[in-house]
């Protein structure tokens, strides 16, 4: 992409309404624009990152054998009355009425809808296990939306649902989702710690939230510092293997880690004092096992091998896709702007032409751009006739992990400069080696294509 042809409305001043770093930088970098309280338009740069994150979520869900689908944003209130949650959910639910005077609602979550789909189409244990998921816009009418996309009213969310014959099968699905989420967050450059949590309005006997440690987090968290040393890494997992998935769950949940809602002071005090930590965290996902709560209420049953009709065991599993942008920025920034991890960066690298209009510099930039594009990478070429300082400031603000700087002086020596946004370290090399270096970096950080 050539910056001269791109829509990137960067702001020099920080908007007064932005209270946290992620909100400030998303506004300044031209990623979002507020349309109403807690509701945002996603501008091209923000949309690219949103789709990169969505792509990683899709890839990891399908790696685990989960089936993508899509449900509507508007639901009938009848299903929610049937489950008993229509009145219980509270004022966060946006209730509407159509022209035929039927009660409808804007989806805050989809347990009822997916259960209705299941009960209409599945009747035999032979069709189990089954896990389906969607990535769709949701709406919760927050009383005080704030912090940009971190606590908006409209949000983009992955929500998945498993249907199993037995509790044991459903708990394996729970463990499988925990493994999937660990892989997903690590690919995004995040350490998201699974913590015992409260089921809230969704309910459930067993639930973990995934939290990213950050000073601006809304949740107070208590944890054993040993958990921050754990990484999933490149290990291979057979998602059908019960023992493997259970072992990962035990590895990542055996140490104390809880939100303030489920904190147990006595258990926390059993952790060696030097390892006790109290911090704040941003919730970026949650997994639930809630047994037969919805299947019993909505009549989602299957016939077993001996002819009995039994309610299925269920769980639901969510990832806040739009919220993740804010969480990543909160975890990865400096005073110049965003520092995107390689896995979710909107463009793989930036190309800065220090002397636009110089024949040699222009030609070298065009060759770099063509070479990177030819091997499937997505560079952002700043070909504007702007001062070098302004170009560097824009690149630092939008946070691309790598920058290739091209100027007449370096080209006389046959070199360009490759700079890491995270460390600030620069290295001179030939244009050909610069392409090889960027290609090698992203060979280890596969990213979905942007838009």
UniProtKB/Swiss-Prot annotation:
Catalytically driven reaction(s): tRNA(Pro) + L-proline + ATP = L-prolyl-tRNA(Pro) + AMP + diphosphate
UniProt-listed HAMAP family: Pro_tRNA_synth_type2
Subunit structure: Homodimer.
GO BP: prolyl-tRNA aminoacylation
Classification via Gene3D superfamilies: Anticodon-binding domain (3.40.50.800), Bira Bifunctional Protein, Domain 2 (3.30.930.10)
Descriptive protein name: Proline--tRNA ligase
Family label: Belongs to the class-II aminoacyl-tRNA synthetase family. ProS type 2 subfamily.
Function per UniProt: Catalyzes the attachment of proline to tRNA(Pro) in a two-step reaction: proline is first activated by ATP to form Pro-AMP and then transferred to the acceptor end of tRNA(Pro).
Pfam annotation, one family: tRNA-synt_2b
Enzyme Commission identifier(s): 6.1.1.15
Keywords of the record: Aminoacyl-tRNA synthetase, ATP-binding, Cytoplasm, Ligase, Nucleotide-binding, Protein biosynthesis
SUPFAM superfamilies from the UniProt entry: Class II aaRS ABD-related (SSF52954), Class II aaRS and biotin synthetases (SSF55681)
Protein localization: Cytoplasm
Species name: Ruegeria sp. (strain TM1040)
InterPro entries associated with the record: aa-tRNA-synt_IIb, aa-tRNA-synth_II, aa-tRNA-synth_II/BPL/LPL, Anticodon-bd, Anticodon-bd_dom_sf, Pro-tRNA-ligase_IIa, Pro-tRNA-synth_IIa_bac-type, Pro-tRNA_synthetase
PROSITE patterns in the cross-refs: AA_TRNA_LIGASE_II
NCBIfam families: PRK12325.1, proS_fam_II
An example Gene Ontology CC term for this record: cytosol
């Amino acid at each position: 992409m050539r910056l001269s042809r791109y829509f990137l409305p960067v702001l020099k001043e920080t908007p007064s309404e932005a209270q946290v770093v992620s909100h400030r930088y998303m506004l300044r970098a031209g990623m979002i624009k507020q349309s109403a309280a807690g509701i945002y338009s996603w501008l091209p740069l923000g949309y690219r990152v949103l789709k990169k994150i969505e792509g990683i979520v899709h890839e990891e869900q399908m790696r685990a054998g989960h089936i993508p689908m899509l449900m509507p944003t508007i639901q009938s209130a009848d299903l929610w009355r049937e489950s008993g949650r229509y009145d219980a959910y509270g004022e966060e639910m946006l209730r509407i009425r159509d022209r035929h005077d039927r009660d409808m609602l804007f989806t805050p979550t989809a347990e009822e809808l997916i259960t209705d789909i299941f009960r209409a189409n599945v009747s035999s244990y032979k069709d189990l296990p089954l896990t389906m998921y969607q990535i769709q816009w949701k709406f919760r009418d927050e009383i005080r939306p704030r912090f940009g996309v971190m606590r908006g009213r409209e949000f983009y969310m992955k929500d998945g649902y498993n249907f199993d014959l037995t509790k044991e099968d459903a708990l394996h699905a729970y463990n499988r989702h925990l493994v999937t989420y660990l892989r997903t967050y690590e690919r995004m450059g995040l350490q998201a710690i699974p913590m015992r949590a409260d089921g809230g309005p969704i309910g459930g006997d067993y639930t973990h939230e995934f939290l990213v440690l950050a000073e601006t987090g809304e949740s107070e968290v208590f944890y054993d510092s040993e958990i921050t040393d754990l990484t999933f890494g490149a290990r291979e997992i057979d998602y059908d293997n019960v023992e493997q998935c259970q072992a990962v769950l035990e590895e990542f949940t055996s140490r104390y880690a809880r939100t303030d809602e489920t904190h147990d002071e006595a258990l926390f005090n059993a952790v060696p004092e030097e390892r006790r930590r109290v911090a704040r965290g941003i919730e970026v996902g949650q997994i639930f096992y809630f047994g037969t709560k919805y299947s019993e209420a909505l009549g989602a049953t299957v016939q077993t091998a001996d002819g009995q009709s039994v309610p299925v065991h269920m769980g639901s599993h969510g990832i806040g896709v739009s919220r993740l942008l804010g969480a990543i920025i909160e975890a990865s920034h400096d005073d110049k702007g965003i520092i995107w991890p390689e896995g979710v960066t909107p463009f793989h690298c930036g190309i800065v032409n220090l002397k636009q209009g110089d024949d040699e510099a222009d030609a070298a930039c065009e060759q770099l751009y063509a070479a990177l594009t030819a091997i499937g990478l997505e560079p952002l070429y700043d070909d504007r006739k702007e001062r070098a300082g302004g170009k560097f400031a824009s690149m630092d603000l939008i946070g691309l992990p790598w920058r290739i700087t091209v100027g007449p002086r370096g080209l006389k020596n046959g070199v360009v400069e490759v700079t890491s946004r995270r460390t600030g370290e620069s290295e001179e090399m030939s244009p050909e080696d610069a392409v090889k270096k960027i290609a090698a970096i992203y060979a280890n950080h596969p990213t979905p294509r942007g838009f």
